[in-house]
Amino acid sequence: MIDVCPLLTLGYTRVKPQLPSSLASHLLPRRRFVQGLAAGGVLLGVSHFARAAGISSTNTSTGAASVLSGTEFNLEIGESPVNFTGNPRMATTVNGSLPAPTLRWREGDTVTIRVKNRLKEATSIHWHGIILPFQMDGVPGISFTGIAPGETFTYRFKVEQSGTYWYHSHSGMQEATGVYGAIIIEPAQTDPIRADREHVIQLSDWTDEDPMRVLAKLKMQGDYYNYNQPTVVDFFQDASQEGLKTAIDKRKMWNEMRMSPTDLADLSANVLTYLMNGTTPAGNWTGLFRPGERVRLRFINGAANTFYDVRIPGLKLTVVQADGVNVEPITVDEFRFGPGETYDVLVEPKDDTYTVFAQAMDRTGYARGTLATRAGLSAAVPQVDQPEWLAMADMMGAMGGGMAGMNHGGSAQAAMPGMDHSGMAGMSAGGMAGMDHGSMAGMNHAGMAGMDHSAMSKDKASSTVRHARTEYGPSIDMRVDMPRTNLDDPGIGLRNNGRRVLTLADLHTVGGAMDPRGAEREIELHLTGNMERYSWSFDGVEFGKSTPVHFRYGERVRVILHNDTMMTHPMHLHGMWSELEAPDGSFQARRHTIPVQPAQRISFLVTADALGRWAWHCHLMLHMDMGMFREVVVA
């Protein structure tokens, strides 16, 4: 007989809170959660708005958003009934559509967009990745006051770029409830990316629950929706493969750290339905093609909370654009992208059908559609990959072979004596004792606006890790003292899957950097949080307690982001390009949204050529809402 009592000390003591009986009675079968309804979607069509606004509809795909093109646009934000899971709900929609209509612009034109608010609360539209005057950026409290109920706001700006972008609300939880759509900008000159046809593929996620209730549950228990917790069966499987001692030690370590090795995403398929162009997996969005054509697929991650891993079994993907900017073509089998990012890929289908498969990073579900020669066809849908545990490199960066590189602020002291748990007066990094990063004399952290290293090298980011005093407190559950700086890691779940996976190191912007100057100074910020308390911040300071980050107008500044958490954060700076650097300081790629992996330290250059007030935040909506947000002032 096996005595299972010792297993209670190995991470099996947590019990999910019991749901109220009124809610439990409405729980859906897992298949319904993952697949959704075959006909699930917006119940109120766009016909009324189409007649009023002259909306055209694409005729080469089924389930695609309507398309508006030109220079004058009228958008109305209101509510529409939807049903993705069998439970009718109200969504927040644009012109009665989810996703919102695709907007097609032309580089060099001046566009005018009138946005009417038919909600009972304020709303807004942010033009994600678009370079424009800050007054047109659409962030309430930063660039304008928002659009009050019943009011109309007119956005007007010149289009200075081309490529694939998107737009979404920046008010409350409206992005999560449906206010998002694609933007396609035709270049002023001939497009160097040649294709016979194209499809916009916008991925998103949907929850039947009120997003504020979801957030309240996460505040109660940070891993509330994590249904991939280690089980007794997993323990015995690991013991047989790795040995009993290794299996026990691994679980003991995680349990003493009070962290979950499988907490890759805040929300899972147990509360989310994954959508492709507003269509459930069972609904099967379909993009048409003729065999032998070169097809351009414009992928947009418009999800509020989901990283997607995208592949099309049977087809190679040639990545030609990232965040709307052309890159040197790179052929892969798969790519990962987070909320806010976009990728354009070319494919050349030969057969009748292919599945467009986008599995969530935590492997609890997927979005899917079909490329087909005619409507009604479908191809085999792959099984989701097995979920993986976070690796040591995801916790400690460059110190992945030992435990000296991470500081847990009081937890796991007995098991990991090489870590500093004594009140965080200094820094423990296995041989760097005596370096006091609690006082850091000479650095000004009073404003919590990031560390300014004005004297640093112009050619390469500094390598010394500096933690602000504000990182030493209850709102922080870990600090990484020796982060990894490599860009060639595809991330957890993709490292050894047998497929060629895109990494940041593969991306090289055509034409090089926009600004040849080196950095005049450095600003370092740490991405911080406490997963158990579900709080997120920069340098341990939530947005409501922070002061702005200041850029001097016209300067070339290097920004260093250091991820002191075990989650990947897609970081989005409004109004200016982020020019990603390789570890050796060379230019890599121009981005508007950069994913920063756990225990990773990245750097990018910014030319502060956009006067005004701008937002800078994690694009995981709940992280942003809980404090991982800063204002940037360019003056």
Indicate residue ranges for each PLM-predicted region.
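Mobile cap/lid helix-loop segments that border enzyme active or cofactor-binding sites
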Residues: 88, 203-290
